[in-house]
Amino acid sequence: MKLSVLSVLLVSVAQAAAAPWRPREPRAAGSKRLTFNETVISAALSPSSISVQWIATENDGDYVYQEEDGSIKIESIVTNRSQTIVPAEKIPADAYSYWISPDLSAVLWATNYTKQYRHSFFADYYIQDVETLETVPLVEDMVGDIQYAEWSPSGDSIAFVRGNNLWTWSDGTVTAITKDGGPDMFHGVPDWIYEEEILGDRFALWFSPDSELLAFLTFNETGVPTFTVQYFMDNQEIAPPYPRELDIRYPKVSETNPTVKLNILQLSDNTVSTIPIDVFDPSELIVGEVAWVTDTHTELAVKAFNRVQDESKVVIVETASGETKIAHERDGTDGWLDNLLSISYVGPLALGSGDASSAYYVDLSDHSGWTHLYLFSTSGGDPIPLTEGEWEVTSIVSIDQERELVYYLSTQHHSTERHLYSVSYRTFEITPLVDDTVEAYWSVSFSAKAGYYILTYAGPSVPYQELYSVNQTAPLRTLTSNAALIEKLEEYALPNISYFELEIPSGEKLNVMQRLPVGFSPDKKYPVLFTPYGGPGAQEVSKRWQSLDFNAYIASDPELEYVTWTVDNRGTGYRGREFRSLVAKQLGKLEAEDQVYAAKQAAKLDWVDSEHIAIWGWSYGGYLTGKVLETDSGAFSLGLLTAPVSDWRLYDSMYTERYMKTLSTNAEGYNTTAIRHTDGFKNVEGGFLIQHGTGDDNVHFQNAAALGDTLIGNGVTPEKMQVQWFTDSDHSIRYNGGNVFLYRQLAQRLYKEKNRAKKEQHQWSKRSQDWVV
C-alpha cells in the first residue's frame, strides 16, 4: 500500500478523532510533564468514582456503603438521607469486606484475608447483629480457612465453604452438607481452572430466589495432572532452606479435566439431590452457567458445553421432579462459543406460539453473526430476537420486570464505544438512555428494583457520574464530577490520543488507538511502541478514559517521547463472529501479520523514526510479541515480552482448546502456534527482553524457561537476549516491588532503543526524585 492510500484511509477516523498526521493540540494547556511516580507508582491523577451495594427495601434506591472512617451506612440515593448501622468503633479488626443481610438485621464480615488465585481468597467470617452490635464467629474454630460465604435471599441463613465442603449456618447452628471435600473434591467453590476460565469468580453455589433451595456444583479433580509452583522467599526476608511448594491441579491441553456435577440442596431438611447433566460425556462436560429461571424455586437453567466449547446445550431442571430437558442447543463448530454468563430471568409471558404458562429468560447469542439479545422460553422453541444489526450487545445490565424492559450496553454507534439502551420484551421497542450519536463509553449500575441508576461516563474525556430516575431524562444530581482532577490536569501538557481504522490487505479494518508525545511536531522523528494484547474476543482499543499510566509516561518523558499504537488485530472482540473466528485453530498467525502490517504502515509516516519501532505485550500480548519477532519481518526493532505463553501445550486446557481444539485433532496447529523459530530473535536490531514471575500460577514460568532454552540452544547471542525473572511473583508481577522494577526496566530498554547506536545512558539522576517509591 502506498503512503498516499494510507493517508486517505486514515482520514476515516472514528467521529471527532483527529487524523494521526494532524494531531490535536494537547487537551491541557499547562507545561508540566507526567513523571514516572505520577503514572506508575501513584494514582494521584486517576479519576474517582463511587460504587454502591444496592439493597432491596420498601423504597427503591437504597444502598449500603462504607465511610472513610470505616462505619457502615444505609443511604437513600434519592433523598440523600443516611443511617449508620455499624459505627466505626464496632468494625471488626482486620476487616477486609462485608455483606449486609437482605433483611438488614446483620452484617457478615470477612477478616484475616489471604489471597489465593485471581478471584478466590481465604478468610475468617463474623456475623454482627445490627441492633446489639455484638459479633460472633461464623465457625468457632476457624483459622483463616473459610473459602466463601453468602447470605440467603431471605437473610436467615448462610451457605459457606470450608475445606472444600459445603456448610450452612442458620440461627447459630452450623451443619455440614458434604463431608468428602478435600484436595481433589470441591463443593460450592470452583477449582483453579473453573475459577480462571469458566465461572470467573470464587463461588459455585446459587440460592433460589425464595431461599428454599441451593444449587451447587461439585468438581472432582481425580486424575487431573498436578503442576507445582515453588515459592523461594514465601513472604520472608531471608529465604527458607527449602521453597514452599504449592501443588495445583492444572489440566493442560488434552490432559484430564475435572468432572462436574450439579446438586440441589433442600434447605428445610438439608437433603441433597444430584441432578444428572448427561448431554455430553462426563469426561467432556463443562458446566458454564447456572441460573434460576423462576421467582421461586421451580426451574433452574444450566448451560453446558462440550470439552472444546463449540457446542452448547441449555438444560432446564424441574426441581420438584428432578427431571431435565434440553431447551436450546447451539452449534459453534465454525469457531467457538463464549461463556457469556448472561442468562437473566424475565418471568412468565404469552408471546407468539409460546406456551402462556412458560417462563422466559433473556440471554446473549451470536448465532446471527453478531452478539444480540434473545428471549428464550424454558419450554424450548426458537428464540425471539430483541436486537439485531451489524453491531453487538456487550452486556445485560438490568431486568425491570414491572416495566417489562431489558437494559443493555452495546456497540451500536461504534465497536470502540458503549451506549445504554432499553428494549421492551413486550413491544420490542428500543430506547436509548444516552445520546447515542455522540462518541462515548458508558457504564451503569441499576438499583434493586431498576427504578434508579448511576450512569458513569467512562470516556474518552475525564469520567463523571450522575444519578437518574428511569421516569425522567434529566439527571437527579451529579455524584462524581472529578472537577478537582480536571483542574489539576490543566497544569499539565498531556499526550494526545486519537482513534482511526486501518484497512489490511484482506479487507478487514482494524481499530487503532494512537497516543502522540507531548509537544508533538510533525517536523521531528519519533520512536514508536506498539502495545497489543490481541487475544480472542479481547479489546484494547476503546474510548474509555485512557489512564495516565506507563504509556502516558513514555509519551511525556522528554528523553523518551514515544508514540504508541494499540492495534486490535483480527480475532479481537466486538466486531462480529466472523472477525473473531478467523483465528480459530491458528492462534498467533493472523494477529502477528496484522501487527507487522500496521508497523510497516506507521513506518511510512514522515514523523516516525522507522528504525526504532518497538512492541511490548503482557500475557497473550507477550505471546503475540514473540510471534511478531518470529516472523523476522524487520518491521520491529525491539521486543518486550512480559509473562508470555510460548507454547499452547503448556497452557490450561479450557482456555486453549476453546480456540485451538485438542492436540489429536490439530497437532499441526499447535506446532505452528508455538514460538520456536529463532531467526527473527537473532535479527531484531535492538534485541528483546523476557520478563516473568516464578510464582505465576496462570501462565507458568515454564513458558519463559522453555522459550529461553530454545533461543539459547539455537544460537541467539547475549547481546540480543535479556531475561528477567521476578521471584515468587504471580501473573501480575507485584511481589516485593516487582511491578516498579518491571516498569523501570521497560523504560530503560525503551530509552536504550531510542538512542541505539548513540551509546548514551538515560540520565535518571537528573530527576532522581522521580524514582522515589
From Swiss-Prot:
Q: Which SUPFAM superfamilies match?
A: alpha/beta-Hydrolases, DPP6 N-terminal domain-like
A Pfam cross-reference name: Peptidase_S9
> What role does this protein play?
Extracellular dipeptidyl-peptidase which removes N-terminal dipeptides sequentially from polypeptides having unsubstituted N-termini provided that the penultimate residue is proline.
Keywords per UniProt: Aminopeptidase, Glycoprotein, Hydrolase, Protease, Secreted, Serine protease, Signal
Named from the GO MF annotations, one term is: serine-type peptidase activity
Q: Where is the active site?
A: 619, 696, 731
Protein name in the entry: Probable dipeptidyl peptidase 4
In the record, the note on similarity to other proteins reads:
Belongs to the peptidase S9B family.
User: What main location does UniProt list?
Assistant: secreted
Q: Please state the span of the N-terminal signal peptide per the UniProt entry.
A: 1-18
Per its UniProt record, what PANTHER family does this chain match? DIPEPTIDYL PEPTIDASE 4-RELATED, PROTEASE FAMILY S9B,C DIPEPTIDYL-PEPTIDASE IV-RELATED
Catalysis performed (reactions) = Release of an N-terminal dipeptide, Xaa-Yaa-|-Zaa-, from a polypeptide, preferentially when Yaa is Pro, provided Zaa is neither Pro nor hydroxyproline
One Gene Ontology biological process: proteolysis
Source organism superkingdom: Eukaryota
Which species does this protein come from?
Emericella nidulans (strain FGSC A4 / ATCC 38163 / CBS 112.46 / NRRL 194 / M139) (Aspergillus nidulans)
Phylogenetic lineage: Eukaryota, Fungi, Dikarya, Ascomycota, Pezizomycotina
Extract the InterPro entries matched here.
AB_hydrolase_fold, Peptidase_S9_cat, Peptidase_S9B_N, Serine_Prot_S9B/DPPIV
**Glycosylation sites (chain numbering):** 37, 80, 112, 220, 471, 496, 671
EC number(s) per UniProt? 3.4.14.5
Q: Which GO terms describe its cellular component?
A: extracellular region; plasma membrane
Protein location: Secreted
